[in-house]
């Protein structure tokens, strides 16, 4: 991950741990993102979707605050 994306992921995780169920916003870097829980999965398991620099969507799958999978 590049540094901008790392900072953005950290900021999104901080919001997630404040118990906000679904967040859609634009980061200071101009990327749109959505973070949400997946009800079909375990507790503290969620997805973080965002648009990267090239306009492609990137999907990160987290358990707690650890990235366990991603799709580009």
Predicted regions and their residues:
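Acidic, low-complexity, intrinsically disordered interaction modules
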Residues: 18-72
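N-terminal acidic leader/helix
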Residues: 2-28
């Amino acid at each position: 991950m590049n540094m901008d994306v790392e900072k953005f992921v950290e900021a999104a995780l901080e919001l997630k741990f404040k118990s906000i169920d679904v967040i859609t916003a634009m980061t200071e870097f101009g990327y749109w993102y959505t973070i949400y829980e997946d009800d079909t999965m375990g507790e503290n398991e969620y997805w973080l979707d965002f648009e990267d620099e090239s306009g492609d969507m990137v999907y990160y799958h987290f358990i707690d605050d650890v990235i366990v999978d991603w799709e580009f």
